[in-house]
């Protein structure tokens, strides 16, 4: 498949004057829903990948292969530019290079590489940051692994919540100088924090689920933020829906009394049944059941 168009569309958005909220997606159906509702891009988080693929918490036990395969499934289902959280690149700088190669092949439009020391080491009390020099090496490796120059490489740091504003700025400026296309910050809670960073760096900014006072698109746009996450509520809502439906059925509720379900029309839309009906008529001289 040709992934060029979606990467170009994402770069157009990043170069534009406004911040966007991407839709949080995790599989083919959720990506199609986001696309049908008009989201300009989708976001596939590492935590959600672990939940979806393994049923495991966000403790970095998912492999690159598993992550790339799920990203490909999402990408082939539609045309939504997909941003993905590639965590620490699944190892050292050499692993980062391969991570970029695999995710580019899977069709992603953008990926983040972070400077957190992952997975958590023996005896560690919590996450730590790798040295800036090591982070720069990872960013350079990511750029070296990229074949399609339209693929957006995002340098990410969680320093704001660990070491503060000054270290965040130092790290982001180093990654900017290394040549990444965009800068991602996790843990930003106040406007003062964002203002300080926005004044210190030149590249477009990407925020990961910031504090409540920052959810103002006009303000974010004026601070050169071009992408801002709203958490990953769709997956959480889906888990709750499955839980409550199965709970009701287990308790003896008749299936016909379960009302909060997708309509047949919505199911046909998200499974692209009309496409398959057309292909069945064209290639099989047959009608698709239920069309």
PLM region spans:
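Alpha/beta enzyme core
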Residues: 2-232, 236-247, 283-291
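Flexible C-terminal active-site loop/helix
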Residues: 249-291
């Amino acid at each position: 498949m040709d992934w060029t168009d979606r990467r170009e569309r994402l770069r157009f958005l990043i170069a534009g004057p406004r911040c966007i909220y991407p839709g949080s997606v995790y599989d083919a159906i959720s990506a199609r829903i986001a696309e049908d509702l008009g989201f300009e891009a989708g976001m596939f988080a590492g935590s959600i990948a672990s939940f979806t693929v393994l049923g495991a918490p966000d403790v970095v036990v998912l492999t690159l292969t598993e992550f790339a395969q799920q990203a490909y499934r999402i990408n082939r289902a539609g045309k939504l530019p997909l941003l993905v959280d590639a965590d620490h690149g699944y190892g050292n700088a050499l692993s980062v290079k391969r991570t970029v190669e695999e995710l580019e092949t899977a069709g992603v439009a953008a990926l983040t590489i972070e400077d957190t020391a992952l997975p958590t080491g023996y005896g560690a009390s919590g996450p730590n940051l790798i040295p800036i020099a090591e982070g720069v090496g990872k960013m350079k490796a990511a750029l070296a692994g990229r074949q399609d120059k339209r693929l957006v490489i995002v340098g990410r740091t969680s320093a704001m919540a660990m070491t503060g504003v000054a270290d965040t700025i130092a790290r982001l400026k180093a990654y900017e100088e290394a040549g990444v296309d965009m800068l991602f910050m996790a843990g930003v809670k106040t406007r003062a924090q964002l203002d300080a960073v926005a004044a210190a760096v030149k590249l477009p900014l990407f925020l990961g689920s910031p504090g409540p006072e920052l959810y103002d698109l006009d303000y974010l746009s004026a601070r050169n933020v071009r992408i801002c996450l709203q958490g990953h509520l769709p997956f959480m809502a889906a888990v709750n829906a499955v839980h409550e439906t199965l709970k009701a059925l287990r308790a003896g509720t008749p299936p016909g009394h379960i009302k909060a379900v997708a309509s047949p029309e919505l199911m046909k839309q998200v499974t692209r049944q009309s496409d398959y009906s057309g292909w069945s008529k064209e290639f099989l001289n047959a009608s698709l059941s239920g069309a």
